[in-house]
């Protein structure tokens, strides 16, 4: 009995030891040079490389205000307000040259999910950060893959099934220039110790409607994607 108890204890102790050592060798205090080298510093000319923008392109709306506008807009939609809620995404992106926030919907509760799961989430919201206009984009086919879904269509489980060896950062809800909804899921790695020096290797794009996935290395990610590095 003692031997049987000793083996699990030793395994647990070994795991704790590895975690502690991995954390220590990644401390910023002793690996400052390695963290410094994560970024390549290049000399440039700010005036020539950064374009000026006009006043009508300057975002005037913060996330909290966008959330209030989104909830208010959903409350005006009699066919949706009883079944759905606005999700907490509100991702800031550049859409057709305009600063906007986009967010998906989510089911109000388990019963509403059960009643609507076959058709998916019917729309997403676009909030213009300059004009404060809120647009409800209704979809021909509903969004079926989200962070608020259940079982196999939950985004986290879906990614784990398709990319079991990848480590992902937090996904971001975005739309391409044609208004198609996607989840941008950065693939990350730790380059300093076991847990430090997080770097991005690429990103998996998941079509939120069809579930189609594609992986892109950092240099090949589509230009419309805004959220790869957090």
Residue ranges with predicted function:
Residues 2-230:
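Soluble extracytoplasmic regions of secretory-pathway and membrane proteins
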């Amino acid at each position: 009995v003692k031997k049987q108890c000793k083996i699990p204890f030793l395994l647990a102790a070994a795991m704790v030891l590895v975690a502690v050592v991995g954390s220590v060798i990644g401390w910023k205090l002793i690996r400052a040079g390695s963290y410094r080298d994560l970024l390549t510093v290049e000399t440039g000319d700010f005036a020539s490389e950064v374009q000026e923008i006009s006043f009508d392109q300057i975002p005037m709306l913060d996330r909290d205000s966008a959330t209030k506008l989104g909830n208010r807009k959903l409350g005006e939609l009699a066919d949706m307000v009883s079944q759905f809620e606005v999700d907490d995404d509100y991702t800031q992106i550049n859409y057709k040259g305009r600063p906007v926030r986009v967010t998906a919907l989510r089911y109000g509760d388990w019963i509403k999910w059960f009643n609507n799961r076959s058709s998916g989430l019917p729309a997403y919201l676009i909030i213009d950060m300059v004009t404060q206009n809120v647009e409800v984009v209704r979809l021909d086919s509903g969004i079926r893959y989200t962070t608020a879904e259940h079982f196999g269509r939950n985004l986290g489980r879906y990614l784990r099934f398709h990319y079991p060896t990848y480590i992902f950062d937090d996904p971001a809800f975005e739309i391409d220039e044609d208004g198609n909804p996607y989840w941008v899921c950065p693939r990350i790695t730790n380059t300093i110790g076991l847990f430090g020096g997080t770097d991005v290797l690429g990103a998996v794009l998941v079509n939120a409607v069809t579930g189609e996935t594609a992986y892109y290395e950092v240099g090949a990610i589509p230009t419309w994607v805004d959220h790869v590095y957090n």
